[in-house]
A protein has these predicted regions:
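Short hydrophobic/aromatic residue motifs in ordered secondary structure
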Residues: 15-16, 137, 186
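Conserved small/polar residues in nucleotide/adenosyl-binding loops
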Residues: 180-185
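Glycine-rich nucleotide/cofactor/substrate-binding loop typically near the N-terminus or early
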Residues: 34-178
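N-terminal phosphate-binding or glycine-rich loops at protein starts, especially the Walker A/P-loop
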Residues: 4-35
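N-terminal low-complexity segments that are often proline-rich with Ser/Thr-Pro
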Residues: 189-191
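Residue-level marker of positions within ordered structural domains that often coincide
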Residues: 84, 186-187
Length: 191
């Protein structure tokens, strides 16, 4: 069995999804191994354009199994909308789409942290999509994020609430930094 890999080495939209869609029509498995719901990849199926943010590009291929690996961060709201947008095509997601239980979940507070972090950088901001992807990866590497498999445990609510409380403390810190920098700017002498 051979394995082929299409790996993008740029930031942002470089056309990976479109290329994967063209190249993978005869492949059995199409996998996403990292990333999150940024700009998305645009595909055309039955004359209709679709923008997929999380679901792999091979979802329209009749025999392909699509994998979302543990390196992917998933926003449940965006993911649900993607699934709903594809329901008219009668895709059997239970057999065509597999998701790692170790993939991390983007929470609403991750989005807030992303926005607060970006705002605190002022002119040095990086141009984040504000989707909460960076803060989710911070929780992943810090080993305290929520994973897909966590929602099937009895303690998921406690785990969720603990993480949200941590995020709220971080947001308070960002707010105080913004107040400090804006106060300092107000007090600086004009030239």
């Amino acid at each position: 069995m051979s394995v082929n890999l299409l790996l993008g080495l740029q930031w942002g939209d470089e056309g990976k999804g479109k290329i994967v869609d063209v190249l993978t029509q005869s492949y059995d498995i199409i996998a996403r191994f990292q990333g999150g719901p940024n700009a998305g990849h645009t595909l055309e199926f039955e004359g209709v354009k679709h923008v997929l943010h999380t679901i792999p590009s091979g979802i329209f291929h009749p025999k392909a199994i699509n994998l979302i690996g543990n390196g992917v961060v998933i926003d449940p709201v965006i993911f649900k909308k993607e699934l709903e947008n594809l329901t008219p095509y009668n895709i059997d997601f239970t057999s065509k789409l597999l998701i790692s239980k170790k993939a991390h979940l983007i929470l609403p507070t991750h989005r807030l942290l992303d926005a607060a972090s970006e705002a605190s950088k002022g002119k040095a901001k990086i141009g984040s999509t504000l989707k909460g992807i960076g803060p989710t990866y911070m929780d992943k590497t810090g080993r305290n994020g929520m994973r897909v498999g966590d929602i099937f445990t009895k303690t998921w609510k406690k785990r969720y609430n603990t993480l949200v409380k941590k995020h709220l403390r971080m947001l308070e810190y960002h707010d105080s930094c913004l107040l400090y920098t804006s106060d300092a700017a107000d007090d600086s002498p004009s030239v």
